[in-house]
């Protein structure tokens, strides 16, 4: 089974993904502040992105792009 090369991201998800590619590992609170999303919106977005396989959570509320 080959991993899907391209994943369709929503525009807001693409903003977060590009941010994580640039920053590497980052705290959820910092992502929310820098990208301008409320935490309650960002947490759902991060979950969707994790399920799509484009980011992964790390201990301590850190996230990174895969």
Where are these regions (language model features)?
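Short beta-alpha connecting loops at secondary-structure transitions
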Residues: 1-2
């Amino acid at each position: 089974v080959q991993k899907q090369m391209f994943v369709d991201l929503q525009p807001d998800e693409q903003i977060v993904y590009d941010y994580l590619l640039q920053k590497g590992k980052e705290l959820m609170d910092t992502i929310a502040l820098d990208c301008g999303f409320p935490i309650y919106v960002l947490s759902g977005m991060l979950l969707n992105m994790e399920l799509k396989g484009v980011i992964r959570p790390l201990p301590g509320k850190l996230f990174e792009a895969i």
